[in-house]
Structure formats: structure tokens, C-alpha cells
Amino acid sequence: MKRSDVMHAEVAHAAKDKETRSAVDDPITLQIIRHDLVSIPNQIDRNITRTAFSQLINEYKDYAVGIVDPDGNLISQSRGSLLIFAANALGTAVRDGLSLHGADNIAHGDVLISNHAETLGQHLNNVVMYTPVRADRGRGEIVAFFCVLMHWIDVGGIMVGSCTSTSTTEIFQEGIQFRSVKLMHRGVRSDDMFRMIQCNTRFPEMLTGDVEAQIAGCLLGRDMVGQVVGKYGVERFRAAVIAMWDHARRLSRMAVEAAPRGEFSGYAFLDNDGVHMDRTVPVGVRVRLDGKRITVDYADVADQLSGPMNAGRNGGAVAAARIAIKYLFSPEEPLTEGDFDLLDVEIPEGKFLSAHRNAPLGLSGHMIPTTVDTILRAM
């Protein structure tokens, strides 16, 4: 190559870098992208409400819609659905899938599902479905994952509804598990997977309708995020995401710096453990604030219970702490990973909010409100 050609290429590359930096630094463009990313899950949320079959979804709205980055960090989440789900579940499922498959083996058009108890720490009805958003109309790198978590009305187990028993003693009595398995591969449905799902539920027609709504939400959301990436470019997209996180971090930092410093305690109890109606369950929480970080310490909560009123660490201790912090510090702002940058969660393994592998989790959501309230009371 001639020296003049090299110089021309260097000048063109420098001009392109300058243009990219200028676009990335443009606050108006970043705000437009930010509002797109906040709006898309809300639009898919409404679509799911209209298209799902079961009342748990179209009336109770027992689901969540969100976008996470290639590492599973939350970018945005729909406001109309249950906060507990996307507070921790979406990114946790995606990270586990990446560890199993690797990013290169999750292709455009792949749709994966996970309700793995050890990973998510919630009852098996809560199924995360996710699909990659790849740049360059599906041919480029993964820039995000679009996720829809939905409460499946029945996944087998010893009781109708799967999560309604008070007598289960291990997770295997509560239904079927999926650990980031592909429901679709490169846009082609797995008939084997659909048959497996339909043969492990008491309501195959209704559940299939919900799953179809979940798939449609994933694919439409993926395309909408892909359009944003295609319009503004990967660098602008990433810059907008970082700006969202930075904004949330600033709000959290201001709140932590303004809060009184010290260790604060809260105590409550559950009326029973779901099996023994005369046995209360203590919920003791300590919150430490040092002006820089906030630590939620669950050392004083009850040990793992014999029945299904347990949750794993991600679905119990971490989820409850994140919900409490979000409610306390910036409830009016969109939910994003930056909200939790200053949060540490400490809990020994084997508590009822950090249950061991294979523990029953059927009633995993029942103790979360009390736990959140106890954290808020401590603060």
C-alpha cells in the first residue's frame, strides 16, 4: 500500500472515531436511546397482557419483561409487571446460559428457557425465556438479550398449579426443570421441547397459549431493540446503557451518603412455615451503612425449612434486598443494574432465604414481602 493511501486511511479512521465520540457524547442522542430502551419492555408488556391465555398473566400480570446486556446486567424492565422477577432473575438466567453454552453458541433466532431452581432460587413456575439481540441484523456480536419471565400455570409436581402444596420436601416433587435449554434454534421450533412441556402440565392448551405469547414477546422485543442498535450503532447503544447505569449509581450514591451511618436492625416473623401452622419463622435483618456502601446481612433469619417456604439465594436474599433498596432510594426511576452497584448481600448458605440445592421452593414468593418490609423497617 502506498504511503498516501495509508495516510488517507488513517485520516478516515480518525474522522470516524471523532464522529463516533461526538455521537456518544451527544446527550440528546443518548436520552433518545435511553427512552427507547425503557419504552420497549413496556410495549411488550402490554402485548403479553393482550395475547396470553391464562388469567395469571392477562389479569394478575404474573410476569416481567426486560433487557439485559451481554453479561446479564439489567438495562431496563417493564414497570407494569412484578418487580420481584426482574430484580435478579433475568440476568441470573442469562449468565447461567452463557456459562453453559458460550456466547458463540447462542445464535440469532435461538430462544432459551430456564426455571432451574439452583440458579434462579424461585419456584419452578417462574420460567425465564430469553433470546440474543445481535448487531448487523442478527449477523454481528451479541449486544443484549431480550427476556420475558412468566409464571407458567402448571409444570407438574404433586399438586395442581405446582406451587400450591405445603407438603413437598424436595424440588423434584414440584415439577419439571429446564436449565437454559433451547425452545427454538436459529428460528426453528423444537417440536420435542414443546411436546415435553405439554406432557408435563395439567393444562397443556392454556399453557401453550401463554408460551406462544412469551415467545412472541421475546422475538418482537428482540427486533425492536435490534432496530435501535441498527439506527444508532453499537457504540451509541452501549454509551446510552452506561449513561443509564451511571445515572442510577449517582442517585444511589447520593442516598447512601445522606443516610445515617451505622448498623440498624429489623425483626419480623412469618405466621407459620407452611407445614407447621403453630411454628413461627423469624426474619431478622441487619443493615449496615458506612456512607459508601450498604450491606444487608441476613445472618439472623431462620434456617432452611422442611417444607416449600424456602428460596434460593438469588431468588430470596438478593431479590428481597434489591427490591427494598429500589423502593427506598429511587422508586420513580426505571429499574436498572446501576441501582444496585453499592449493595452487598451477606447470608450463610442453608437459611430459608438461601436454601440448599434441591430444597423445595414452591412457596418461594410468600416470604418476600415480609423480608422487604423488615429491611425497610431496619432502615
Which residues are covered by each model-predicted region?
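A short, hydrophobic, proline-anchored segment that marks a local hinge/packing element in signaling
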Residues: 126-137, 147, 287
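Short, compositionally biased leader-like segments
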Residues: 2-47, 98-107, 244-259
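Gly/Pro-rich active-site capping loops and adjacent beta-alpha segments
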Residues: 141-200, 303-307, 315, 319, ...
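N-terminal leader/propeptide and maturation segments of large enzyme subunits in energy/redox metabolism
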Residues: 17-33, 174-253, 374, 379
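Short, basic/aromatic recognition patches
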Residues: 36-60, 98, 102, 113-122
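Accessory "access/gating" subregions that flank catalytic or transport cores
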Residues: 219-303
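Regulatory sensory and allosteric helical modules in signal-transduction proteins
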Residues: 73-77, 88-116
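Hydrophobic core positions in small helical hairpin nucleic-acid-binding modules
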Residues: 82-89, 105, 120, 197, ...
